[in-house]
Amino acid sequence: MSFLRPTLALLAVTALVTTSAQLNGYSKKEVTPEDTELLQKAQSNVSAYNSDVTSRICYLKVDSLETQVVSGENYKFHVSGCSVNSDKELGGCANQNCESSKYDIVIYSQSWTNTLKVTSITPAN
């Protein structure tokens, strides 16, 4: 029975480290249709943009997604997209032949308060 103690201790530490990483940092997530719908809903609604978000883009494709648990959830979408000139062009790109670049779009969601905010749009590194 004493041989189980080190194994159980290791499992407990591993669970604690994993939980801490998910609460404090971003974790990769498989993109689902629901995630893409959340991106479209927030990114196409200019009133959902924080006042300091001045970039305006449409997205062609979601390349990957990371999430972070906070007082809700941050979604960091890595997308291919194009700069646009009007708020009517936000969301999915109507012009699939635009000159695209890579962007990171961070959306904050808190489902129990119906909060959905675009907190940043930055060129990807």
Curated annotation (Swiss-Prot):
It is found in: Secreted. The record marks G25 as: Reactive site. Keywords: Glycoprotein, Protease inhibitor, Secreted, Signal, Thiol protease inhibitor, Virulence. Residues 1-21 form the signal peptide. GO terms for cellular component: extracellular region. GO terms for molecular function: cysteine-type endopeptidase inhibitor activity; peptidase inhibitor activity. Its main location: secreted. The keyword Transcription does not apply. Induction: Expression is up-regulated during infection of host tomato. One of its GO terms (biological process) is symbiont-mediated suppression of host innate immune response. A motif (Secondary area of contact) lies at residues 68-72. Glycans are attached at N45. The keyword Glycoprotein applies. Belongs to the cystatin family. Interacts with the host papain-like cysteine protease PIP1. Interacts with the host papain-like cysteine protease RCR3. Interacts with the host papain-like cysteine protease C14. Secreted effector that interacts with and inhibits the pathogenesis-related papain-like cysteine proteases C14, PIP1 and RCR3 of host plants. Inhibition of host proteases by a pathogen extracellular protease inhibitor forms a specific type of defense-counterdefense mechanism between plants and microbial pathogens. This is Cystatin-like cysteine protease inhibitor EPIC2B. The gene is EPIC2B.
